[in-house]
Amino acid sequence: MSCPEQIVQLMHMHLDGDILPKDEHVLNEHLETCEKCRKHFYEMEKSIALVRSTSHVEAPADFTANVMAKLPKEKKRASVKRWFRTHPVIAAAAVFIILMGGGFFNSWHNDHNFSVSKQPNLVVHNHTVTVPEGETVKGDVTVKNGKLIIKGKIDGDVTVVNGEKYMASAGQVTGQIEEINQLFDWTWYKMKSAGKSVLDAFNPNGEE
């Protein structure tokens, strides 16, 4: 078409319903004298009428479901990989719990050896550990698979793992007392110990 660009713009304005009366008059005069523009305008009107006539057509209710059913099934491994990529923190925590929980489970069932912390004024006989009356034991005391009898003073925490604790009337503990006789308690204790070791490694001088 060699007609002015303005005429094409007026066609679009007319089809959009935005044309002014004076501009519509200009367009009509041109269409009466220009066969090419008149044919082009007629084709545009037919196209718009066709689109409007099909605007009420809707896809069947089950169209989406049918299309999805015909698509290739995603491999289960791929969906698992996608879940791990979108939930990295949860995945890491789950793996940590599985690995650490399994290790703690084996440790709990296989470790039956008696052990005790190494303070010099603890009295150890067979599997019995005694804090003598009048003695003050400095630091945390841990007894595994044995018995702890407290007659004196412990200046720290007490942890008895899979054992027994007796405190005489004169016995004293300045810190916390924890008795661990269940697998869950053991797991929690080991996790706390590991966390404490990490903190100590980053803060060797005990600074806050």
Swiss-Prot record:
Q: What induces it?
A: By different stresses causing damage to the cell envelope, such as alkaline shock, salt shock, phage infection and certain antibiotics that affect cell wall biosynthesis.
Q: Name one Pfam family in it.
A: zf-HC2
GO molecular function annotation = metal ion binding
Transmembrane regions: 88-108
Report the locations given in the UniProt record: Cell membrane
Primary localisation category: membrane
The UniProt record gives the binding positions of Zn(2+) as 3, 30, 34, 37
- Cytoplasmic topological segments: 1-87
In what way is this protein post-translationally modified? Is processed by successive proteolytic events. First, the extracellular region of RsiW is cleaved by PrsW (site-1 cleavage) in response to cell envelope stresses. In a reconstituted E.coli system PrsW cuts between Ala-168 and Ser-169 followed by trimming by E.coli Tsp; the endogenous extracellular exopeptidase responsible for the event in B.subtilis has not been identified. Next, it undergoes cleavage at an intramembrane site (site-2 cleavage) mediated by RasP.
Source taxon at top rank:
Bacteria
Keyword Transcription regulation found: yes
Altering residue 129 to M: what's the impact? No longer requires PrsW for degradation
Q: Which GO terms describe its cellular component?
A: plasma membrane
Q: How does it assemble?
A: Forms a heterodimer with cognate sigma factor SigW, which probably prevents SigW from binding to DNA.
Q: What is known of its domains?
A: The cytoplasmic domain is able to inactivate SigW and the extracellular and transmembrane domains are crucial for sensing and transducing the signal that triggers SigW activation. The N-terminus binds the zinc ion and is followed by a long helix (about residues 40-80) that fits into a hydrophobic surface groove on SigW, probably blocking its ability to interact with the -10 and -35 promoter elements.
| Family membership | Belongs to the zinc-associated anti-sigma factor (ZAS) superfamily. Anti-sigma-W factor family.
Protein name per its UniProtKB record: Anti-sigma-W factor RsiW
